[in-house]
């Protein structure tokens, strides 16, 4: 089909959408509000569905080369006993690829490198759209106006464009948990590639990177907006008595590297991901809690599906209708499952509830864990060409 497209938001989903559009013949501009693209320092796990989407977009091999496969790990108690283990090799046999861990900044750089020079513009804030014409969308930029056949709203959980397109609709809500995370300053020795540890009202996890360092995260049930003068000191007090390597990971972290964000989600699903010639994508469409590690993967699915629909359908309208029909039910189901996983994980605090959960996990056969992962990760992208 081809045409001109404006992608609002230069995160993982927005860049992936731009890659897909560019590969299928569209002239694309990406508008990012941030003035610089210095990454905040987080890491990310990519499941098979996210990697397959990246393969469809042509960047899968580069991402795999920069990632570390996550073969060994599972879920533990604060004392260190195992609640469940995951066989990454078995998962690879089932899906053709393991889960991989990668620094978000590295992934972002690989996506940027796949776009033409000059495609990405930073320091550009989009606060409105001109949708008066039936076959075009105007995007106000500074004192001018960009004219587009298609706009992709990938401006995150707090999307301004979502609020404009669906006035009066439910926006993001606080999910009841806050997350602190960082990447270690130096390589660390880890027995497992990834771990989750569930305590009462708290979770601690890590993923290992190819350079020997690791990202860790700590999720706490807390009121929204609570901050700490010394976040790393607070974490040492809260998690210092938990099993190794948790204290070791904290010791290997610089205080200024710790990031702190409240978790928000779209608890009320959108009735559509499309409004005229505008498509919502990623967190702007289906912001979810991070409990399944599927947020970025779902955004990558969005990007590949949108590009394929626009490549095969005869009109923008039919392509966006196909995109909405294929992506909205699946992504919203994953968001519901992530919310349920959070309730079973760090949100449980009563000792009896925690004990019952732990007993259930210990008794569950390993194939139950495998099925839970396959339910969301076993996805095949549509062909772009």
PLM regions with names:
Residues 1-5, 22, 47-166, 170-183, ...:
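Conserved N-terminal helical subregion
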Residues 33-36, 43, 67:
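Residues in the short beta-alpha loop(s) of Rossmann-like NAD(P)-binding domains
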Residues 193-225, 232, 236-241:
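Active-site substrate-recognition segment that forms the wall
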Residues 159, 179-181, 202-205, 285-286:
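Histidine-centered metal-chelating micro-motifs
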Residues 7-35, 152-153, 180, 255-349:
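Conserved mid-domain beta->alpha element of the FAD-binding
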Residues 26, 59, 244:
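Short phosphate-binding/catalytic loops that engage adenosine nucleotides
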Residues 227-260, 316-317, 324-325:
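Flavin-binding catalytic cores
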Residues 1-3, 65, 80, 248, ...:
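C-terminal helical "tail/cap" subdomain of flavin- and related membrane-associated enzymes
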């Amino acid at each position: 089909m081809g045409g001109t497209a404006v992608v609002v938001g230069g995160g993982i989903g927005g860049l992936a959408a731009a890659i897909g559009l560019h590969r299928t013949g569209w002239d694309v501009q990406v508008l990012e509000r941030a003035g610089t693209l210095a990454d905040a320092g987080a890491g990310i796990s990519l499941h098979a569905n996210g990697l397959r989407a990246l393969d469809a977009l042509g960047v899968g091999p580069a991402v795999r080369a920069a990632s570390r496969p996550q073969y060994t790990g599972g879920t533990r108690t604060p004392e260190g006993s195992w609640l469940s283990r995951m066989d990454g090799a078995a998962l690879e046999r089932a899906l053709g690829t393991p889960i991989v861990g990668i620094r978000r900044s590295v992934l972002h750089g690989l996506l940027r490198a796949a776009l033409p020079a000059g495609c990405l513009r930073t320091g550009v804030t989009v606060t409105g759209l001109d949708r008066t014409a039936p076959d075009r969308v105007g995007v106000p930029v500074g004192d001018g106006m960009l004219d587009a056949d298609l706009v992709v709203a990938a401006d995150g959980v707090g999307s301004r464009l979502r609020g404009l397109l669906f006035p009066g609709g439910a926006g993001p809500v606080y999910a009841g948990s806050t997350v602190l995370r960082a990447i270690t300053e130096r390589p660390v020795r880890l027995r497992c590639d990834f771990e989750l540890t569930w305590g009462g009202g708290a979770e601690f996890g890590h993923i290992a990177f190819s350079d020997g360092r690791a990202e860790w995260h700590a999720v706490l049930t807390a009121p929204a907006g609570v901050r700490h003068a010394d976040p790393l000191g607070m974490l040492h007090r809260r998690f210092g008595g938990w099993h190794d390597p948790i204290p070791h990971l904290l010791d290997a972290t610089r205080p200024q590297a710790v990031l702190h964000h409240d978790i928000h989600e779209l608890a009320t699903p959108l009735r559509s991901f499309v409004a005229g010639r505008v498509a919502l994508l990623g967190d702007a469409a289906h912001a979810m809690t991070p409990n399944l590690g599927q947020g970025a993967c779902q955004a990558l699915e969005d990007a590949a599906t949108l590009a394929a629909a626009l490549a095969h359908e005869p009109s923008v309208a039919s392509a966006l209708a196909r995109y909405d029909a294929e992506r909205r039910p699946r992504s919203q189901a994953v968001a519901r499952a992530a919310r349920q996983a959070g309730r079973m994980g760090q949100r449980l605090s009563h000792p009896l509830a925690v004990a019952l959960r732990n007993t259930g996990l210990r008794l569950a056969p390993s194939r139950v864990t495998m099925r839970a992962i396959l339910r969301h990760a076993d996805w095949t992208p549509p062909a772009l060409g």
